[in-house]
Amino acid sequence: MTMTDPVADMLTRLRNANSAHHDSVKMPFSKLKGHVADILKAEGYIASWKVEDAEVGKSLTIDLKFGPNRERSIAGIRRISKPGLRVYAKSTNLPKVLGGLGVAILSTSSGLLTDRQAAKKGVGGEVLAYVW
């Protein structure tokens, strides 16, 4: 059976592993998931990620990041644009997550960008997710 929304599956796996205080989470790899993991790493929400070759396909392993007392670095993560209802934002109307404390991940013509990077470049696009 094919997966309808691989990004939502990735975010759900991250959310579940984070709330269960797992050290890492494993999922099927795709280029889009790799770019989302790049953004999460650059913004400081995850410790690291790597791609492993499996017999059937590639696998993405994300190492979660926790504070000194095992407090979570990801307080919340939400999928915004879904296959049934796409959500787009113009460059003049980019979303702010928690007044700028969180990050919005956008798919633009310049690749995947955060809301701040998209505002700097002056591009809009599809709002994939909010992370805070």
From Swiss-Prot:
<dbReference type="Pfam" id="PF00410">
    <property type="entry name" value="Ribosomal_S8"/>
</dbReference>
<dbReference type="InterPro" id="IPR000630">
    <property type="entry name" value="Ribosomal_uS8"/>
</dbReference>
<keyword id="KW-0699">rRNA-binding</keyword>
<dbReference type="GO" id="GO:1990904">
    <property type="term" value="C:ribonucleoprotein complex"/>
</dbReference>
<keyword id="KW-0694">RNA-binding</keyword>
<protein>
    <recommendedName>
        <fullName>Small ribosomal subunit protein uS8</fullName>
    </recommendedName>
</protein>
<dbReference type="GO" id="GO:0006412">
    <property type="term" value="P:translation"/>
</dbReference>
<keyword id="KW-0687">Ribonucleoprotein</keyword>
<comment type="subunit">
    <text>Part of the 30S ribosomal subunit. Contacts proteins S5 and S12.</text>
</comment>
<dbReference type="InterPro" id="IPR047863">
    <property type="entry name" value="Ribosomal_uS8_CS"/>
</dbReference>
<keyword id="KW-0689">Ribosomal protein</keyword>
<dbReference type="GO" id="GO:0019843">
    <property type="term" value="F:rRNA binding"/>
</dbReference>
<comment type="function">
    <text>One of the primary rRNA binding proteins, it binds directly to 16S rRNA central domain where it helps coordinate assembly of the platform of the 30S subunit.</text>
</comment>
<dbReference type="GO" id="GO:0003735">
    <property type="term" value="F:structural constituent of ribosome"/>
</dbReference>
<comment type="similarity">
    <text>Belongs to the universal ribosomal protein uS8 family.</text>
</comment>
<dbReference type="GO" id="GO:0005840">
    <property type="term" value="C:ribosome"/>
</dbReference>
<dbReference type="InterPro" id="IPR035987">
    <property type="entry name" value="Ribosomal_uS8_sf"/>
</dbReference>
